[in-house]
Regions:
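A polyanion-binding, active-site-adjacent surface
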Residues: 1-154
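Short, flexible loop segments at boundaries between secondary-structure elements
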Residues: 77, 81, 144-179
Length: 180
């Protein structure tokens, strides 16, 4: 499926080159997502262990077997936000449960800037989680093109409170309203 999804090809070519510069695993873009035709980017912190494990899917996807993916899928579905979506990470490589070092963070931010350059139709970025929001504010301020929506992390720690659950739901619904 990966090689038959034209919208994902340019991103996959970028990912392949980027992965050559990393010792950590770099998951693939989801071929079911919009790829370079994305209008909404859901930006999370970093890929989870399930994504890059030998048994895992190898994709950053709402279909992955983890709570963040499930929450993203559920809220997008409830908001009827089905098309023009891409899911990716601020630090696009697996960190083995550790917090990213400053060097890893900078590498992730540089990679993100490259990915944003491959998304000419991007209208909305949903920043999911404190780390992602902080890195965007610190490093991406010059990007005025997409509308930025701040949201809690859809992962288990981020969704502990009912308020965070509702805030995430409202962020997804706002993204839907903005892109129609």
């Amino acid at each position: 499926m990966l090689h038959s999804a034209p919208a994902i090809q340019e991103l996959e070519e970028w990912r392949e080159e980027f992965a050559k510069t990393r010792t950590e695993p770099v998951p693939h873009f989801d071929p079911a997502d919009a790829g370079s035709a994305a209008r909404v980017l859901f930006l999370l912190d970093s890929p989870g262990a399930e994504t890059v494990s030998a048994e895992g899917p190898g994709f950053v996807s709402v279909d992955n077997p983890d709570q963040a993916a499930e929450r993203c899928w559920t809220e997008r579905n409830d908001a009827e936000l089905h098309d023009g979506i891409l899911l990716w990470n601020t630090v696009p490589f697996f960190l083995d449960g550790a917090e990213p070092t400053p060097v890893q963070t900078i590498a992730g931010v540089k990679a993100l800037k490259s990915v944003l350059g491959l998304l000419p139709r991007l209208e909305v970025v949903v920043l999911c989680g404190t780390f992602t929001k902080n890195q965007w504010a610190k490093h991406m301020g010059a990007f005025s093109r997409p509308t930025v929506i701040k949201a809690p992390s859809p992962g288990s720690r981020g969704m502990i409170s009912k308020k965070n659950q509702e805030d995430f739901r409202q962020a997804v619904r706002r993204a839907k309203r903005l892109v129609g």
